[in-house]
Design a protein with these regions (language model features):
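Nucleotide-sugar donor-binding/catalytic module of glycosyltransferases
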Residues: 1-186
């Protein structure tokens, strides 16, 4: 069992895929598996995935019929062996320390989930740091209801909608499996 499985759904992203995969290979946390889920992409992505498979033993490839983003993420969950699971969209790149930092938070607080800020890079190259107005730390059920829910619903970044997304989080895989948490494919 590896420490962290990183699921990457792939569809028509050959322009961005190399940058994404390289950012995953550059993680300071080395005990990872990178699961590239080719969601029936009609471009060169399937071949690119096979090439990556030869580059690093931490890479796994799943080829499947196109079923959409949720279906691809679920396919990745199904083959993940990590104690924790993260998701990265294939047109994104992440900082080298992202998963090490998220793991350290989970380990420190013994929690099932950790979330980071992220930086949105616009087409014109402008960068915007996006974060929830939430203090770092452990949140029990009452604190989540009181402090987190209101921020998710009426956060200060309404121009982009709520910032709760899977691609800047790390999850305990046992928690996901225990409650059969999957992405809705409907």
């Amino acid at each position: 069992m590896v420490l962290v499985s990183i699921v990457v759904p792939i569809y028509k992203v050959e322009k961005y895929l190399s940058r994404c995969v390289q950012s995953l290979l550059n993680q300071t946390l080395k005990d990872i598996e990178i699961i590239l889920v080719d969601d029936g992409s009609p471009d060169k992505c399937p071949e690119m995935c096979e090439d990556y498979l030869k580059v690093d033993k931490r890479i796994k490839v799943v080829h499947k019929e196109n079923g959409g983003l949720s279906s691809a993420r679920n396919a990745g969950i199904n083959v993940a062996t990590g104690k924790y699971i993260g998701f990265v969209d294939s047109d994104d790149s992440i900082l080298p320390t992202m998963y090490e930092e998220l793991y350290n938070v989970i380990n420190k607080y013994n929690c099932d989930f950790a979330m980071s800020d992220y930086e949105r890079i616009m087409r014109d190259g402008r960068e915007n740091l996006k974060s929830l107005n939430i203090a770092k730390g452990y949140y029990d059920k009452n604190r989540i209801i009181k402090e987190i829910y209101p921020e998710l619903i009426m956060g200060r970044n309404l121009d982009y909608g709520p910032l709760l997304s899977v691609w800047h989080c790390l999850y305990n895989s046992n928690f996901l499996r225990q409650y059969n948490l999957r992405f809705d494919e409907e």
